[in-house]
């Protein structure tokens, strides 16, 4: 009777944790499931993988197996182990084999391993305006139910009313404890994680806690200064444009950015000079007067003389 190398069958290492082994089992169970696999030895491999999982998934059985494996080359072990030659060998025989070799003192009472359920992640889209205050959101998602082979047997629809706190940021994760998949053998449920996705805004760009908005100005507004209406997340405000403002200049509007527990960011209005349409004869004459008055001004001075 040969002691099978369950770790090799699962493609894992003896030092791997249960989560890693479970991932390997599910991958192999899907690969060799007789209903989906076209490989000639699929059924035999599937049974072998299921047998390995039944031992390695149970904390006590895995400890017993590790002890058996450690002594597999000892002459005394081999003599006693060979007494089981010809008997069917599977995971359910494990307790009897271990007890006959090491005696009852070498093991504890058998118990099934309690395993925590899986976490579930869903993406929740939030508008920028919604980040200013806490708000309620109804979310719907599906909780997968796994069969004994680690395959999804069905999905249970679920709906929750949740609170989205003020000041959430893009990529932030909100944990809802116990709302994931059910645990196994009395283990705790997994959690539901809401991953916040801030929806793109037609006006504002996000830079950490700050916001940026492009502020279009006519050439004379930039040159002479002006008071213009600027949008914020809550309302429009009147912003003073200093004379001689330049394209690309950033005007800070304090406290009009995104809020968080620590501080509130600022809004930056970035000036963009917008030229009027092609001038008519009268407007062209005015532009010419301006050009004559500013004849010494060279916007390309940094290039040097030709």
Swiss-Prot record:
Q: Name one GO biological process term.
A: chaperone cofactor-dependent protein refolding
Would I find Manganese among this entry's keywords? no
Write down the CDD domains for this protein, in alphabetical order.
DnaJ (cd06257), DnaJ_C (cd10747)
Which domain of life does the protein's organism represent?
Answer: Bacteria
Could you tell me the keywords of this UniProt record?
Chaperone, Cytoplasm, DNA-binding
Q: Which residues form the J domain?
A: 5-69
GO CC annotations? cytoplasm; nucleoid
Which molecular-function annotation in GO is an example for this chain? bent DNA binding
Q: Where in or outside the cell is it found?
A: Cytoplasm, Nucleoid
Keyword Chaperone assigned: yes
Pfam families tied to this protein: DnaJ, DnaJ_C
HAMAP family found in the cross-reference section: CbpA
Describe the function of this protein.
DNA-binding protein that preferentially recognizes a curved DNA sequence. It is probably a functional analog of DnaJ; displays overlapping activities with DnaJ, but functions under different conditions, probably acting as a molecular chaperone in an adaptive response to environmental stresses other than heat shock. Lacks autonomous chaperone activity; binds native substrates and targets them for recognition by DnaK. Its activity is inhibited by the binding of CbpM.
Q: What is this protein called?
A: Curved DNA-binding protein
Species lineage, top-down?
A: Bacteria, Pseudomonadati, Pseudomonadota, Gammaproteobacteria, Enterobacterales
């Amino acid at each position: 009777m040969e002691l099978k190398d369950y770790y090799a069958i699962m493609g894992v290492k003896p030092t791997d944790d249960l989560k890693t082994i479970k991932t390997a089992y599910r991958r192999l169970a899907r690969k060799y499931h007789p209903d989906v696999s076209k490989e000639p030895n699929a059924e035999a491999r599937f049974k072998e993988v299921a047998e390995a999982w039944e031992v390695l998934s149970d904390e006590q059985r895995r400890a017993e197996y590790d002890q058996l494996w450690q002594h597999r080359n000892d002459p005394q072990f081999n003599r006693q182990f060979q007494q089981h030659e010809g008997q069917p060998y599977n995971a359910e025989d494990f307790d009897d084999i271990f007890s006959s070799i090491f005696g009852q003192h070498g093991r504890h009472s058998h118990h099934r391993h309690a395993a925590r359920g899986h976490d579930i992640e869903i993406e929740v889209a939030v508008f920028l305006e919604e980040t200013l205050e806490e708000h309620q959101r109804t979310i719907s998602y599906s909780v997968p139910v796994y069969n004994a082979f680690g395959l999804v047997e069905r999905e249970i629809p679920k709906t929750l009313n949740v609170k989205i706190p003020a000041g959430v940021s893009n990529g932030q994760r909100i944990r809802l404890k116990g709302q994931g998949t059910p645990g196994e053998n009395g283990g705790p449920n997994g959690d539901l994680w809401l991953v916040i996705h801030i929806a793109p805004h037609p006006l504002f760009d996000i830079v950490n806690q700050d916001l940026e908005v492009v502020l279009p100005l006519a050439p004379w507004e930039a040159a002479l200064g002006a008071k213009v209406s600027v949008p914020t997340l809550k309302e429009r405000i009147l912003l003073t444009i200093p004379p001689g403002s330049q394209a690309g200049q950033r005007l800070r509007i304090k406290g009009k950015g995104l809020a968080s527990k620590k501080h509130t960011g600022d809004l930056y209005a970035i000036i963009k000079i917008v030229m009027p349409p092609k001038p008519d004869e009268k407007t062209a004459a005015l532009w010419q007067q301006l050009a004559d008055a500013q004849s010494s001004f060279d916007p390309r001075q940094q290039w040097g003389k030709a």
